[in-house]
């Protein structure tokens, strides 16, 4: 028998006292830990050496190490298969014994150099639900990029510089790639660090100037408009507030949350376009149908309402939500899990 639980560390799969944690939020005392990708909300600080065996991709491991997370060597175990989740470079879902599939953060849309997720058949599906509400339906990638290019073209015609805003790891590399035809292209130094890592793994990043070099060379003060790619944050933030005020730049944010108009106003952006590295609601339904599971567990975001909607569609779904002071515990019949000894 197999327990699927949510505790203070996150989602855990337990069989006869042997535990596998899925993207824990802090270091657990467990046999195995799966890290799906290198966003900081899926990484944990390794406080002590306790023999944790880490299952993750080489790319995720390298990016995590670069960001200051020390995990030692990664570990491969029979019965566990990493499958591209399409979220960011190196991101993976985990297929356990060909029967249980954990998505991690997932996208089934091809975006620039990012391939769509590989979704297997599985009896049990543990699926993220960040945008698991029917209100969150995204336009296709190409139309979003086209809209952004129209805005940039208009601003360049008027001599106005433009700031594109996206997450430092993942979104910013896509922005660097798809808007590389605009010159001069300037990239925030923190994004440049991630771009260099992507280049090491074969993703071509065309020539650009870092923000610090552009500032030193006085490029920002020239009469020629420029395009800056920077980490997404509120325009009330000191850096963006300074750039907008000094150079008269306009801002374009990219996020799945931009489906709602309040997001643009909350961050004080001039424009905001729906572009996400997650599945939208319809994509999540597509993942479920392709996986065709007997049992579904939803986690993160709209976990409860998404599970309810899946049940209305004829699936058997429950949210994995930790109740305060309690373990949300579910018994799963999957006797083959952890029955084989470690190699």
Question: Could you tell me what each predicted segment is?
Answer:
Residues 2-28, 32-163, 170, 177:
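His/Asp/Glu-rich metal-coordinating catalytic cores
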Residues 11, 19-28, 73, 207-227, ...:
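Short acidic low-complexity segments
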Residues 31, 64-69, 82, 111-113, ...:
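Short, charged, surface-exposed secondary-structure boundary motifs
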Residues 52-62, 126, 184-194, 253, ...:
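Short internal beta-strands
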Residues 54-57, 165-166, 274, 299-300:
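Active-site-adjacent beta-strand anchor residues
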Residues 88-97, 106, 110-111, 124-134, ...:
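Active-site-proximal loop/helix segment associated with metal-binding centers of metalloenzymes
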Residues 118-119, 133-220, 295-343:
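Binuclear metal-ion centers of metallo-dependent hydrolases, dominated by the metallo-beta-lactamase
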Residues 214-343:
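C-terminal regulatory/interaction regions
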